[in-house]
């Protein structure tokens, strides 16, 4: 972590450093620092790679969930989907969020949208949960709860 912090200080305009540092703060459960750094990442002029921006938005949503700001989390999930609509991860995390709210039409919409994406992007941003059983499981739960067994 000290090296990431140093890199972010030495290159404050480098979006990758800001993204990585924010992500690491999130992994360590330092929600406030994570949020601050991820917001900084999104505000940087050179922060233009949609996949990385969408990941920062998903991480911001996770920070919001961990600090009890569910509605704000949903806004970040929506923004992540809008930023990178060709990536499954935003849809799957949004579907998971809706499952926690028992919003079964929302779960179905987001999980089916994720499953409609069949080409896995070849970047490090991919997360296994989006390409394994999770979107299928969420979709099945939604169908069951909606009486479409």
Residue ranges of model-derived segments:
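Catalytic-site signature of metal-activated, phosphate-bearing donor transferases
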Residues: 1-36
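Residue at a conserved register position within TPR or TPR-like alpha-solenoid repeats
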Residues: 25, 64, 98, 142-143
